[in-house]
Amino acid sequence: MVETRFGKIPTSFKLMKNGELPMVVTDYVANGSFAALKANVKLYQEDNYAYFIRNTDLKSGTFEVFVDKQSYDFLSKSTLYGGEIIISNVGDVGSVFLCPKLNKPMTLGNNIIMLRPEQNSLKYYLYIWFKWLYGQALIQGIKGGSAQPKFNKTDFKNLPIYLPDDNLLEKFHKIVDPMFELIDKNNSENQYLAAMRDALLPKLMSGELDVSDIDL
């Protein structure tokens, strides 16, 4: 074991920077200037081609903003497939989520960054690292702005991280993967039940659906 700013860690752990890890770090504005985004991205409050994933949606578990196919294609540098690590970098700085797998295409919203590790075994380690006390302290240490706290991708990429050797990382992944898969399954079931509720409730209120004969 060796003493570090994060406490004692195994000597086999490597000290690296986030930007040196084999992963994609991107955000909404990676797709173009603010003028280009305004001209090419249209948001909808009603159902459309793809979900526009925001920090507030990830917090609430409800996804109610959409983009059309043209906007989705324009935002190709921030496409989401599910399982990416998402971190809020404006306003509510440091909120960390795993992107859920939803029932249609998804694209990253504004004021958040997305991390997509090339190694699947890195995903949960990084998620837990950034939610952990010291990971959060590092993120809070790079935020600036008086009116609205924020941090940029460059500063984030320069943050230090201790990485286990590949063998230990793989063992860790095998232990936690079933746990996260169960969480994802439960979230999917909740999404399905919420959609069913939203579809049936208006019919019940209008009288189109009659449940008076159901024996409870």
What spans do the regions from the language model cover?
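Non-catalytic DNA-recognition/assembly elements of restriction-modification systems
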Residues: 1-35, 158, 162, 166-208
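Sequence-specific dsDNA recognition surfaces
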Residues: 19-43, 51, 55-82
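Hydrophobic/basic alpha-helical segments
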Residues: 123, 134-137, 174, 181
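A short beta-sheet element
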Residues: 54-55, 74-135, 142-147, 152-153
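Short, charged, low-complexity amphipathic alpha-helix
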Residues: 144-149, 154-174, 213-216
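Glycine-rich beta->alpha junctions and the first turn(s) of the following alpha-helix
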Residues: 113, 124, 140, 160-163, ...
